[in-house]
Amino acid sequence: MARYLDYVPTIIVVEPDSAACVMESIKIGKIKKIDIKRESLMGGMSCGEVSLVPWEILKNSVKYCISLPDDDIAKTMKLLGNSSFSDDKIIAGENSAPGVISLITSCEDQAIKEKLDLNEKSNVLVFGCEGDTDQEMYQKLINQN
């Protein structure tokens, strides 16, 4: 990737702590299957094994991995869907919220901010590839107290 870019971005993978297969695979340098003992609210990311095609890219480009519990998923979905947060509502599902949670948490921790070189001049791109695919579940989660 570096030969095509003047600046190589820092790539961070975020996944459920109960199914951190990318993190475990990066640690050992080969695909590691995770025995999922508890399903995550982040169902689409709770797969337990990295697919071969993305692994060929991830193994050489991921700089950091973050694994998260389900605790803040609903709160973050609600924050993003709050129209006072932005001009438009951001309808983020359970698999889109983790990247935002990681960014917020990283910005609140000075040591992590320094490690990631996060500052007021940073450009951050967070991928969120899911909206309210299950509208009933989405409403239930964002309306929790």
Q: What does each model-identified segment do?
A:
Residues M1-N60, K113-N145:
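Glycine-rich phosphate/pyrophosphate-binding loop at beta-loop-alpha junctions
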Residues S51-D117:
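Active-site-adjacent helical/loop segments in soluble small-molecule enzymes
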